[in-house]
Amino acid sequence: LRKRALWFVGVLGLTASAIWADDKINVLVWDEQQPVPKKVYANFPGNYIVDHLKKNPRLNVASANINQPEQGLSIKALDESDVLIYWGHVRHRDISEAKSQEIVDRVKAGKLGFVVLHSAHWSVPFMVAMQEVAAEDALEQLPENLRAQVDVRYKGELGWNMPKPDA
C-alpha cells in the first residue's frame, strides 16, 4: 500500500511539475485507425484527440498509427515522447509483446506516461503493463530478504477473454 501511495504522490508531483514547467510536454497519440471508428470520426479518433490537444500551448503533440513503419511506435518516437496516449478498438493483438515491453520499460523507468483509451485495456501493451503490476504485487507478499531470489514468470500466452460485441 505504501508503494502505491508513493507512486500516486509521485504521479501528482510529476503532473504538477509539468503544469508549471517551462518545457513543453511531448505527447504521442497512437491510434489503430481501423474502419469502424472512421464511420463516426471521419479523420479517426486519434486525430481528433491530436487536434484538441494541440490547442494547449504547453504540449507538443504528434500523431502515430498502426499503419506507419514500426506501427508508429519506433524507438525514436517513444524516446521523443513524455506521454503515450493509446487509442485501441479491435486490433489489440497487432502490437507484439516485445514492443509492448519497450513501452512498459519506459513507463517503469519514469520516462513515459501511458494513457489507455477506449477498449485499449485489451491491448498487448496494457496487458503487459498489468502483468508487471501483478508481478510487483506478488513480490510484495514475500519477506523483503527473499524478493531478490524470486523470478516471476508467466506461463503461456496473454489471454483474451473479451466479451462478445453484443454483450
Predicted regions and their residues:
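The substrate-binding groove and active-site-proximal loops of carbohydrate-active enzymes
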Residues: V36, I85-D94
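A glycine-rich, often tryptophan-bearing local segment used as a flexible ligand/cofactor-contacting loop or short
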Residues: R91-A167
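Aromatic-Pro/Gly-enriched surface loop or interdomain linker
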Residues: W20-S81
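A cross-family glycoside hydrolase active-site/sugar-binding cleft signature
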Residues: A64, W87, L117
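A generic local structural motif
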Residues: T15, E70-L73, S100-E102
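N-terminal secretory signal peptides that target proteins for export/translocation
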Residues: L1-K3
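Bacterial N-terminal signal peptides
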Residues: W7-S17
